[in-house]
Each structure stands twice: as C-alpha cells, then as structure tokens.
A protein has these predicted regions:
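Conserved phosphate-binding/catalytic loops in two-lobed NTP-binding clefts
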Residues: 240-259
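Gly/Thr-rich phosphate-binding beta-strand-loop-beta motif of the actin/hexokinase/Hsp70
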Residues: 101-131, 145
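Nucleotide/phosphate-binding catalytic cleft detector across ATP-hydrolyzing
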Residues: 1-108, 166-172, 177, 187-191, ...
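N-terminal phosphate-binding loop and adjacent alpha-helix
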Residues: 1-14, 144-147, 151, 256-258
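Short glycine/threonine-rich loop-to-helix capping motif typified by GTGT followed
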Residues: 100-102, 230-240
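Hydrophobic alpha-helical bundle architecture
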Residues: 210-215, 222-225, 248-254
Length: 259
C-alpha cells in the first residue's frame, strides 16, 4: 500500500543514482534534486516528503570533484586536526542563493564571468541541469590592452576599470592611467579591444547554452554574475546585443553587495 515519503526514501533515491562511489578519479560532493516524480510520473514535485505514494523517482543532479583535489584538502584538514571538510560548487551556491525558488521552478541560465575563468549553468529546482566552464574572463580584457599598447599590466587594469562602452567617443577621446596620467590610450581603440574580448566570451556562452540542450528563446534571460565584466560600464548591454538575449545582473540581496 501507499506510504508517506520520508527523508529515508529521498536519501535512498540519491544513493541509488550515485554511480561515482568507487570511481577512480571523481567523487560526489553533492546531490540535489531537480525535481521528483511519484508513481505514474504525471506530476513533478519540488518537495515529496509527507506525500503518500507507492514509488518515488526523480531527476537528480550529482556534483563531482576530482579526488586529487579533495585528497589535498583532506590531508591539510588532518594536519590541522579538523574533523570534517565540506566541498561546495560555487556556481551551484550562486544559483541557490541568487535565484528565488519560484524562478528555479523553471530552468534558468546563469553565466558567472570571473577574472580568468567563467562558467555557464542551467539551474532548476535544487540542482544543476548542466555546467560548462572555460578559461576566459574580465582579466583577459586587461591582458589584451597591455599587449596591444605594450604597457604594464597594472596600467591596463586601471584603464579597464574606466572603460565605458555606452558612450560615443571620437578620435580625440582618451583614457588615462598611471601616476599623473603617465599613460594615454585612445578610447576608441580600448573600447574595440574590450568589445572583441566580449565577443569571444559571448561566443563561449552561446556554445555552452547549445551544449546544455536548453531551448532558450530570445526572451529567455541570461543571469550574469561574477566580477569579470559586470563592472565594465555598458558590458551588460553589449553582451545582450551580441547574444540577442536579455541580460540581468544578479547579486546577493545584502547591503553593500546588492549592486
């Protein structure tokens, strides 16, 4: 007969689906339900506990980590006499903390563009439907400027912080960097360098979306986070134009962090 679903039933479901328990290279650091189904699978549930059913199934997300990585930190923890080490996927944590439960009822796209690495994830329920990472970020904008103008990286970083892609510059416009404006850069050239790098980042985001299998139409927003390009004025609008999708910057709903 039907019985109420309990924590033990959910735990058993997660255990049955984990095929990485004895994997030589990877270990599971988290398992999260995208959704649950009961009996005839005609309905999806976010929370099945307490519901009477004969059978529970579901789509579960397993987050993996290389054993070489976990072994390193477990040895450090052992030396420090720490009893336990917990590993958390950063983009999973972003999805859970920055997107409301109502939004996560449907699949959502997060693009975390960092300084030198970026990730694109499809989030649903309490899990990740897909995750792609690539070695590109806002730091590459500064690197391109330093290389093209043959200036110190510190000066290129300073210029990057002044970029404004929303303004219409002319040939007389310039950015300054260094002590007493030691370095001058054509604003037109700097902006073109930044746009070129953003084009590449947008291309990788598009490829990641395609690989995920998520059918994201022109009205499907891309939630942008990370400090790589969100601080570049006009970058959000430019990426939206290139990707042909609305871009929304998301940040923690905490004073001084919600910008």
């Amino acid at each position: 007969r039907a019985q109420r679903i309990t924590d033990a039933d959910v735990t058993e479901l997660f255990e049955q689906g984990d095929t990485y328990k004895n994997h030589s290279r990877y270990t599971t650091i988290g398992n999260f339900a995208i959704y649950y189904t009961l009996d005839d699978k005609t309905r999806r549930f976010v929370e099945p506990r307490g519901i009477e059913a004969y059978k529970i199934t579901g789509l579960v997300s397993y987050v993996l980590c290389e054993r070489s990585f976990t072994s390193l930190f477990e040895n450090i923890a052992k030396d420090l006499r720490l009893k336990e080490v917990e590993y958390v996927s950063s983009i999973w944590a972003e999805g859970m903390s920055l997107l409301s439960e109502d939004k996560r009822y449907r699949r959502q796209l997060i693009a975390d563009v960092g300084y030198i690495t970026s990730s694109v994830a499809v989030v649903q329920g309490d899990g990740l439907v897909s995750l792609t990472s690539f070695s590109l970020g806002g730091g590459h904008v500064a690197s391109d400027i330093a290389m093209m103008f043959e200036v110190p990286f510190s000066a290129a970083e300073e210029v990057k912080d002044k970029i404004d892609l929303s303004l219409a510059y002319d040939e007389t416009s310039y950015y300054e960097a260094g002590e007493n404006g030691k370095y001058r850069f054509s604003a037109l050239d700097v902006n073109e360098i930044a746009k070129s790098r953003l084009d590449t980042i947008a291309e990788f985001i598009s490829e990641s979306i395609a690989q995920s299998g998520f059918e994201c139409n022109a009205h499907c927003p891309v939630y942008l986070t990370g400090n790589g390009v969100t601080t570049i004025r006009g970058a959000k609008e430019y990426l939206s134009q290139v990707l042909k999708k609305p871009i929304e910057i998301i940040a923690p709903d905490v004073p001084c962090y919600n910008k």
